[in-house]
Structures are given as structure tokens and as C-alpha cells.
Curated annotation (Swiss-Prot):
Compartments reported by the entry: Nucleus; Mitochondrion
Keyword Mitochondrion: yes
Alphabetical UniProt keywords: Mitochondrion, Nucleus
GO CC terms in record: mitochondrion; nucleus
Miscellaneous field: Present with 125 molecules/cell in log phase SD medium.
InterPro entries named among the record's database cross-references: Gfd2/YDR514C-like, Gfd2/YDR514C-like_C, RNaseH-like_sf, RNaseH_sf
Full protein name: Uncharacterized protein YDR514C
Source organism (scientific name): Saccharomyces cerevisiae (strain ATCC 204508 / S288c)
Major location category of this protein: nucleus
Molecular function terms, GO-annotated: nucleic acid binding
Length: 483
């Protein structure tokens, strides 16, 4: 058998395995590390360091824990101040960079002029295309169909609206961001907040159980604090991946792959639901609320991809969220006194993308690819929060936008359209080393050489994971991330 035929057969075998959503015995054996306690292994759960083997999980236990939840920290308390480094951050005030601010304002002024020109040309061209549609309809049917209860008229109206929508979908550039409008102001404010390096960014991502979306299985958090990055060449980003212990054995498999044990940025923290809430609340109370006069000089923002859903999930499990500024329109109070809460901004990567390029292709994975951000194992909450934060930092960096031509909406539109075409024409890429390693892992008999000696297995995937660690309380889990 030729090597190409072997590779083809191996590829087909793994595609078949993936199609079965990790339900085949071969993939389960490969996916799970050795040494699992039996009760969790039967549920496809990952090995967790330090976890009592007899500890149980499941839908019933999750809902029981959820019904008894008590958020002990409330809206203000945080034990993160007990750690010297973090407590010292309260004494750092934001110092405006006059030269940088001038460059940002110059960029925003040019952006408004550019977008206004693009909007006028795009609208004029789209109007001509729509007039042509109307003309063809009148020639063919005598008139433009109005809304009617008559079935024939109703079907004609439906077809007409579909033709209009097709023209709008194919039109480039998509312009949802007219200068002077609320969306353009949101875009400009986002760029100003991030480019000036004065905003503490708190990115969140929540994964739920697809067979009961009231059950939160993972929470990912990634934090960029400019107070820690004043003198940094490489940005310091603090990433956390929380796995709800009661939901540990619950695996998604119908709509998305379950990658809860594939966190790339450290060790996953497995905590009881109540302690997950305490962990999140302590971070929010520290980063998103002001305690000192110096604190009030910084802006604060939650970051997410379609973030409203993640905020809703946090509230559902009992997390107290500060008052939010969804549209970035609430006035800033420069005279705010010590301890008084400022509105926390909401920065949404999906919203920014849709404003500039339209709603089509707005998934996180597609945006990461479009803006050249390496990524893997999406739908792990910790990974997604980290990627979303990086994406937002790029979208809000005026210099990055200039370098990649993000504001050339026509060129970006054709680039996005090209990706859609390639997706339709090209197969998904699955690394051959992963294909063969899965096949090797399923071999019941080891390979031997001509002398009967066992051959070492090769083509081991090189992605390294730190695994998961059980903690009884949130404070101990947080402390473990500082080492």
C-alpha cells in the first residue's frame, strides 16, 4: 500500500471518529489520560489533581448547589488586596500622555472624514443597485408588491424582499457605522479607551452545557491591567480557567467539541460552584471597582464576544456586576470621590466587527483568523477569554488598525468575502500528525521491528497542557496562579 493511500485511510478514519463527536471507544481512550478514577472515567471526565475520587457531579448536583448559592463577598469585599503586589496597584494613578493623545485624536478625525466619504459613496452605489432591482420587478410584474394578506401577493412580496436582501448582502463595503451616529461614536470611544492605555480590561467567556444551558460548566477570565504594563515590553495578561466541579462530568458533544481540559495558558482550576462565584466576585471587586482616588483615574471595561450573554450567565449564578455602560455614552465624572463606583464600560468584539464589516462571518474563530491571531482549542472558556481580549486590544489599537488597513472597508470586505469562498471550496485542515497519533493510540498491538523488538511510538502531538487542579476554596486557587 502506498504512503499516500495510508495517509488517506488514516485521515478518513479520524474524520469518521470526529463525526461521532468523540463517542467512539478509540477516541475516548486517546482523549483520557491514564489513572482516572472509575466514577469520572465513565462520564468522559478529565483527570483532576488532588480531587477526591469519590466526589460526584452531574445535573442534579449542579442544580442542588445552584439553589443554595450565597455570594458571601457581596458588592465590595475582595481578598485580593491581601496580596502585596495587587494592593500596591491601588496607589498608581493614570498619567495622560499628551503626545499620544494628540496622535489618537488626529487619527479619529481622519477616521471620521474617511468613513463619511465611504458612507456617501457606498450608499449612493447601493441605492443604484436597489433602483435596478425595483426596475426589473416593475418590468416583470407591473409593480412593487406591497404587504398584503393575499397569498399570491404575500409570496411575491417575500421574493422581492429576498432579492433586495441578496443585493445588500453582496454589496461591498457594508456600512453600519455612519459618522455622527451612535455606532460610530462607540467605535471611536473604544479606540480612544484602548489606544490611550488607560483602561483595565476584564475579558470573560462562559461555557454552558448544551443539553441544559442553565448549567454553567466553565468560566474563562483574562485581565489586562495597564497599571502592570507601564514599563512592559511584553504585555502581562492574567488568565484564569475555572471548571465548575459539579459540572465536571458533563461533556458537550452535539454542537461543539468539549475542550474543558485543553486550557493553553496554565492550570485549570476546578472549584465547587459557590467557590467559582467567590473567585469571580473577588476579581470583579478588585479590578472593576474603585477604592482609592488613584483608582478613579483609570477606566474599566468588561470585554467579550457577544458579551451580553456572558454577563447574563454571571448574574444567573449569583455574581454581582457593577452598573454597566453598554453604549459608552454615560458621562465621565472627573470629580468622583474615593470608593464611589464608576460605570463599567462594555467592549464587544462582535459589535465592533459588525459595525465595520457587517454581521456575516462574525464568529470568534473567523475574527481571529482575519486579524492574524494564532489560536487553538476554541470553546475552552479560558482560551476564548484570552483570545477575545487579544482581539479587542488589536481592534482598539489605532496603530494596528493603520498598519493592516482595518479602516479600508472595501479591501477588508473583499478579504472577508475571499475567506468565505475558500471555506466553501477547500476542506478543513486537520494536521496529519494528529490523525496518525490517534491511529497509533488505538493500536492494540505495539509495532515491532524485524528482530521482534518493540518500536517506540512516534508523531506525538506537541501541544502541552497543564492539566486541572482541584481546590476546596477560591483563595487557595487564586494563590496557586501566582507561583
Amino acid at each position: 500500500m502506498s504512503s499516500s493511500t495510508k495517509c488517506k485511510k488514516a485521515y478518513e478514519a479520524v474524520v469518521k471518529m470526529v463525526t461521532h463527536r468523540f463517542n467512539s471507544k478509540a477516541v475516548r481512550n486517546y482523549h483520557q489520560p491514564q489513572g482516572l478514577n472509575r466514577s469520572l472515567a465513565t462520564r468522559n471526565a478529565a483527570r483532576v489533581r488532588g480531587m477526591v475520587p469519590s466526589r460526584r457531579g452531574g445535573v442534579g448536583l449542579y442544580k442542588s448547589s445552584s439553589s443554595k448559592l450565597m455570594n458571601k463577598l457581596g458588592r465590595q469585599k475582595t481578598w485580593i488586596n491581601e496580596f502585596e503586589h495587587f494592593n500596591s496597584l491601588h496607589e498608581i494613578a493614570y498619567t495622560p500622555n499628551i503626545a499620544l493623545s494628540s496622535e489618537i485624536q488626529k487619527y479619529l478625525k481622519a477616521l471620521e472624514t474617511n468613513y463619511r466619504s465611504i458612507y456617501e459613496k457606498s450608499s449612493e452605489l447601493l441605492d443604484k443597485k436597489l433602483e435596478e432591482i425595483d426596475k426589473k420587478w416593475i418590468e416583470k410584474n407591473g409593480c412593487i408588491p406591497d404587504a398584503s394578506k393575499d397569498d399570491v401577493e404575500k409570496n411575491l412580496r417575500k421574493q422581492y424582499l429576498a432579492d433586495v436582501q441578496d443585493v445588500k448582502n453582496e454589496h461591498i463595503p457594508v456600512m453600519n457605522c455612519e459618522p455622527g451616529g451612535s455606532q460610530f461614536k462607540y467605535l471611536c470611544k473604544t479606540i480612544e479607551l484602548l489606544s490611550s492605555n488607560k483602561t483595565i480590561c476584564f475579558a470573560i467567556d462562559v461555557e454552558a452545557f448544551e443539553f441544559d444551558t442553565d448549567i454553567v460548566t466553565e468560566i474563562g477570565i483574562a485581565i489586562y491591567d495597564p497599571r502592570e504594563n507601564i514599563y512592559s515590553l511584553m504585555p502581562i495578561i492574567r488568565s484564569y480557567h475555572l471548571i465548575v466541579a459539579e459540572a465536571l462530568p458533563l461533556r458537550n458533544k452535539k454542537f461543539v467539541c468539549d475542550f474543558k481540559d485543553c486550557f493553553l495558558l496554565g492550570e485549570s482550576l476546578v472549584l465547587p460552584l459557590e467557590q467559582c462565584v467567590e473567585f469571580i466576585q473577588s476579581l470583579i471587586n478588585f479590578y472593576m471597582k474603585c477604592e482609592t482616588d488613584q483608582d478613579t483615574t483609570w477606566e474599566r471595561a468588561f470585554v467579550g464576544h457577544a458579551i451580553a450573554g456572558d454577563i447574563k450567565w454571571l448574574k444567573k449564578i449569583g455574581v454581582h456586576v457593577p452598573e454597566l455602560d453598554n453604549e459608552l455614552t454615560k458621562p465621565e465624572d472627573s470629580t468622583e470621590s474615593k470608593g464611589v463606583r464608576k460605570h463599567v464600560k462594555m467592549l464587544d468584539t462582535e459589535k465592533i466587527y459588525s459595525m465595520c464589516y457587517g454581521k456575516k462571518g462574525s464568529s470568534l474563530g473567523k475574527l481571529l483568523r482575519l486579524f492574524h491571531l494564532p489560536h487553538a482549542f476554541l470553546h475552552n472558556a479560558g482560551n476564548d477569554a484570552y483570545y477575545t481580549l487579544l482581539l479587542m486590544l488589536k481592534l482598539g489599537d489605532y496603530n494596528f488598525r493603520k498598519q493592516i488597513g482595518a479602516d479600508d472597508l472595501e479591501t477588508m470586505g473583499y478579504r472577508i468575502r475571499e475567506w468565505f469562498k475558500r471555506e466553501a471550496d477547500e476542506p478543513k485542515i486537520l494536521p496529519m500528525s494528529y490523525v496518525l497519533s490517534v491511529m497509533n493510540a488505538n493500536n492494540s498491538k505495539p509495532k515491532v521491528d524485524d528482530k521482534g523488538r518493540k518500536k517506540p511510538r512516534d508523531l506525538v502531538p506537541q501541544t502541552e497542557f497543564s492539566g486541572s487542579h482541584w481546590f476546596q476554596n477560591a483563595r487557595a486557587a487564586f494563590k496557586s496562579t501566582l507561583v
